[in-house]
Amino acid sequence: MPKQSIQSVEPNIADLVNGWLKSYNLNYKLEQESLNDSIDKALDEYKSKQGGTGGNRPDCKLLAKDSYGTDYPVLIEYKGYKDRLIKLDENGNVAIKTSDNKNDYKKINSYAVNGAVHYANALLHYTDYTDIISIGVTGWKDENGNLQHEIGVFYVSSKNFGYGQDVAKYDDLSFLKPENFDTFIEKVKSLNLTEEEKSKSIEKREQEISASLVKLNNDIYKNESGLSESARIYLVAASIIANLGIKGENPVKPLEKSDLKCSSEKGERDGDIMLRKINAFLSHKSKNIPEDKKNLIIQTFSDALLTNENINKPTNGESQLKRVFSKVIDDLGLYYKIGLTTDFTGKLFNEMYNWLGFTQDKLNDVVLTPSYVATLLARLARVNKDSYVWDFATGSAGLLVAAMNIMIDDAKSSIKSPDEFKKKEAEIKATQLLGLEILPQIYMLAILNMILMGDGSSNILNKNSLSDFNGDYGFPPKERIEKRDLKFPADAFVLNPPYSASGNGMIFVEKALGMMNRGYAAIIIQNSAGSGKATEYNRNILKHSTLLASIKMPIDLFVGKSSVQTNVYVFRVGEAHQKDDIVKFIDFSEDGYTRTNRKKASVNLRDTNRAKERYAEVVDLVRFGKNKLNIFTEKEYYEGTIDPENGSDWNQSAPVDTKPTLQDFKKTVADYLAWEVSNLLKNKAEDSLGK
């Protein structure tokens, strides 16, 4: 007899669970019923489980309220087979993405928890809800025909980057009953990612961001004619700010696609609507963003959104601006709404410029620092919660974002009072970071980046750091104005300068370090700056600062963006370099990452040889010396001296010992004898065969 296929018991499971919910007196909604306008719209926006557009329909959904009045969306998905509760990926997360960052519709459609987590991501992406309960229930009949069931309960939140965390094992859903729900939420709130889990989740999401940016830019490049690179940058930045929204007192609703009406009426064009939303957002943030800066941002966006009539002109009922806005929030919305502390706009900038026909010199100047290198520089500059960090060629503010994250993490670990931590966090963002960027479109990216990271944009200045900056705050805090002390008290300097500048960019280093009294500096620069192209600047720097380390970076560090060899130089500021001062020379050519340069690849950076441990070891070697050697050996690490009057001897490497040892002699003799014996045996074998 042919083998009978097992019949799904999904209808039985639906009856069972819906019966529970009814007995708990919960106001649940079935697949085709409406829960609320916000959730319905989000589910319609998202791709369906099969990959079509719209029509996400959880089998059951409800809003559960805790005793504080907070609503938690609960999304429930049913399946009818024994092995269809959940499928995890290689990192132990619920599998909803393929390896090339596409929605894994096969698993989303086949497994109950996977479908429920997929729906939860729609809510993170398109609503203000940040905490969602995803439930999967599957069942089967045992050999006696009795219905069995299994439940998976996951907490999906911006705190776990939308991947979800397993709450606990449950036999029913009585934890949703009003009298039990507070206890359940307490359990949910106690869930924390380990540092390793957090690191893996961030890394995975950052890979997804990179892939999404490739897709976004490819779409705009191919389908939206007439937009220059600057226009694209401004439109993307404007779309993100308009879509952010603000909760709490006097809330600002995020701009949605449906708010853009594609009207030709002056004052009601899509650009007018978007600009009003940006104005409302920035006005709400007025405590963090000075009025002068707000006006500059509004004027910049006004030029981008209103001057070009073509982007507001409806074609077939839709404006180009609405199309671009829709693409931005569809491709990127999830990532900036879950609050990733990454150099988001740095990734955006690098991807945008990846498609442009710049000369190599221009590319060398506009390339931005990878986030892991930015973090390396901030750690080498010994940044902590009390540091005052500045960057004289800030780009998209990626180095300042890295420094800010380290400062906030340090504050979080050392300040135990929530109120005091909140106060310190605001102080870090408002008064302890300063960046200067001369190019207007890149300056706007820096502003956007810091807004996304939490409003640390007050002292990002659109100035020439060499000719227009005297060391003062751009927007000084009130207490400094009262004391008439406007100087920014910098004690940490990070920099990736334009290499076409004088001395390959060492002119920036000379000025910045000359304005500091103490602290540390870490810069990444074309390595010829240390071997003759910046001799005079280097001599001057060493009159007031000590070179602590010279680190040779991988040749392919900026693959696809720039082809120059770079070094990182680390300084202690305020002490002149003496001829006997020890300098640590580190060959970091092998940093553990494998890089590729494929425009449409979802991942062009892979940790293939303990990269994270290598970066941590470099920081320790610079700080503590050769007793921290672990992965590296004395072939890559060398302690030597430089001549402070030379200025071109900063790129040394470990000397190669050419003097033969007795062991070398023995090995050579052994190799020779082995070769002779091999030949004798070969000849003897050939003779015996008559050859």
PLM region spans:
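A short, conserved, highly charged catalytic patch centered on acidic carboxylates
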Residues: 1-133, 138-152
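Non-catalytic, well-ordered alpha-helical scaffold segments
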Residues: 15, 214, 230-238, 326, ...
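Active-site catalytic pocket residues across diverse enzymes, especially alpha/beta-hydrolases
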Residues: 25, 123, 381, 407, ...
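A conserved structural/catalytic subdomain of Rossmann-like adenosyl-cofactor enzymes
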Residues: 81-84, 107, 170-174, 178-181, ...
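Short amphipathic alpha-helical segments and their helix-coil junctions
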Residues: 89-101, 207-227, 328-333
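Non-catalytic accessory regions of SAM-dependent methyltransferases
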Residues: 181-249
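Long recognition/docking surfaces used for binding and targeting
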Residues: 237, 241, 245-357
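Conserved S-adenosyl-L-methionine
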Residues: 364-480, 488-495, 502, 518-519, ...
